[in-house]
A protein has these predicted regions:
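Two-component signal transduction core modules
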Residues: 24, 50, 73-75
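Alpha4 helix (beta4-alpha4-beta5 surface) of REC/receiver domains from two-component response regulators
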Residues: 32-36, 40, 45, 55-75
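C-terminal output helix
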Residues: 60, 77-89
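Bergerat-fold GHKL ATPase/HATPase_c domain
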Residues: 87-148, 159, 163, 268-276
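Acidic, metal-coordinating helix/loop segments flanking the phosphotransfer/catalytic sites
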Residues: 3-23, 31
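Conserved polar catalytic motif of the HATPase_c/GHKL fold
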Residues: 152-156
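His-Asp phosphorelay/catalytic-motif detector in bacterial-type signaling
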Residues: 20-22, 44-51
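Conserved beta-strand-loop-beta-strand hairpin that lines the nucleotide-binding pocket
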Residues: 105-110, 158-276
Length: 276
């Protein structure tokens, strides 16, 4: 582990290292400007994962996250959540470990998994999930928020995840009845002492990291407020307390949502894990 107290020290440490780093964590308060170091670091180590650590809002900086391929922002809490810190950095280094709702829950937990291949499956699963969530959320407004986010993820997987050989989307909203043989959407829902959670995974892996980053940037910065594409991910991020995007190209795409039992999360983290 190499540490630095300012940009000058950080640059010197990076330049004097003869082996690639596994990952780099940069405090947003690194003086005088953390992105001065990141820009220099990216020239020497273009593929090393970089994460930011911050206690303040960072969404205005999203274009810089996109520019420098920063796919994780860890929110500093008091006390610091070392489990969250360790898991996030491990996910960046070993992205195959990032998949699955259980990765983000702690024992003791409850976890349910269901496969969706038809509209009937989707409707039955959603009713089962809502009954589960109602055990922990007595207010209809909370349930409506979770349901909206969960359904948005499932719809995104069905209507945007499956494509024809031409690249065109295979299933149309309002016309979907059943996936073709070999296609499936896997959903999970569960809880631990801190969160309710859900995940949606398609077995196509058509989600593209650069497209995801650009769409989120346009929505977060309000440049794409009228865009028809990209609203789904932005909506689910807004409705949840934590969102994790996991991509294994041509294999599977997954989004995990977490909803805190205590709504004290003021700054939302950012997690995007990509298997190269």
């Amino acid at each position: 582990v190499v540490t630095a107290e300012n940009v000058t020290q950080a640059i010197a440490s990076a330049e004097n290292t003869f082996e690639d780093f596994d990952a780099v964590l940069v405090d947003l308060n690194l003086p005088p400007n953390p992105f001065e170091f990141i820009a220099r670091f990216r020239k020497e180590f273009p593929h090393v994962p970089v994460a930011l650590l911050t206690a303040t809002d960072y969404e205005s900086l999203f274009p810089l996250l996109n520019k420098y391929d920063i796919f994780a922002v860890i929110v500093r809490t008091a006390p610091l959540d070392f489990d969250e810190l360790g898991r996030t950095m491990e996910n960046l280094i070993y992205p195959s470990k990032a998949f699955g709702l259980a990765r983000y829950l702690r024992e003791p937990m409850e976890l349910v998994q269901r496969n969706i291949t038809s509209l009937e499956d989707k409707q039955a699963m959603m009713e089962e999930a809502i009954k589960f969530f109602r055990r922990f959320r007595p207010h209809d407004t909370d349930i409506s928020q979770i349901r909206l986010a969960f359904e948005e993820l499932i719809n995104n997987a069905i209507y945007h995840g499956f494509r024809r050989s031409t690249g065109a989307e295979k299933y149309a909203l309002g016309a979907f009845e059943r996936l073709e043989r070999g296609e499936q959407v896997v959903v999970e829902f569960g809880r631990d002492k801190n969160f309710l959670g859900c995940s949606v995974t398609d077995n196509q892996g058509t989600m593209d990291i650069s497209t995801v980053m650009k769409k989120l940037e346009r929505q977060i910065t309000r440049e794409g407020i009228l865009d028809e594409s990209g609203r789904g991910l932005y909506l689910t991020r807004t409705l949840s307390d934590k969102m994790v995007i996991n991509i294994h190209p041509a294999v599977m795409s997954q989004v995990v949502l977490l909803f805190a039992h205590r709504h004290n999360i003021k700054v939302k983290p950012f997690h995007l894990n990509y298997m190269r």
